[in-house]
Amino acid sequence: MSSKFAILRHGITNWNLEGKIQGRTDVPLSKAGRISLSSVSVPSLFHDVEWITSPLQRARETAKILDLKKTRTDIRLIEMNWGEWEGKKLKDLREQHGVSMRENENRGLDMQPPG
């Protein structure tokens, strides 16, 4: 028995365009994100599979625009909590915190944003 597995990233949000960290902030897709997704089609191999999305609006909107039929949300797929850094630009945080920011980023999934 074989399993099918695919990962799709949500469409573009205004915060993506502005370079802001989204984290768990429930930012919707931008107009550009909705338009770009409207020209995307999921390969037929994946038409009849179950799709699981983050509960965040941008992920649910993406699934709806792509016309994914069998969808459900799962809280375990929600974005990392970026705490006080949500809504801020990563480039600004790097300038502001210098070496300590780079060290924190180098921790990968163990990175600890404040708040």
Residue map of PLM features:
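Active-site-proximal alpha-helix that buttresses catalytic centers in soluble enzyme cores
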Residues: 8-69, 96
